[in-house]
Amino acid sequence: MTSQRKEHYGKINRDKVLGFTWDNKEYFGYEGDSLASALLANDVRIVGRSFKYHRPRGVMSCGVEESGALVTVGSGSRRDPNVRATTQELYSGLNASGQNAFPSVNFDFGGVNNYLSRFFAAGFYYKTFMGLPPFEWGKGTGIWMVFEKIIRKAAGMGKASREPDPDSYEHANDFCDVLV
């Protein structure tokens, strides 16, 4: 472990060391750590990127109110996006990665949006490319269809697995009481 940890503080079991993977890199933590505390102890500060300008985001709190440290846990059909690193318990073999960044959270090509921020007014993505004359459906909406895909891809959060769910459940709640 690194020197980022205080020796005799915290409610962790220092006798049980757990290995985990963050962005394809091996790290170690202790039983009782959250993913966020283990990353901070290993001197990992950037865990995600903001959705619009792709600015670096780190751990800012220690509970469920955390909005900057959303990560993807697992892989394949067991991939679980938008997990708060502060509430994810560390376990041996945990595979986690940052979200909303390409190729990684430390170097993100989407960060160029930060330099173009003066051209991106708040809410620009709602009606900017809707059509001509302004906001008239049917005329000029083809350009919106093109830009909508690009904007949604750039502004997305974690990506859910497209594979079938491998788990089985006791029963499925596949009905609704009220449909509007």
Spans of model-derived segments:
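Residues forming the flavin
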Residues: 1-180
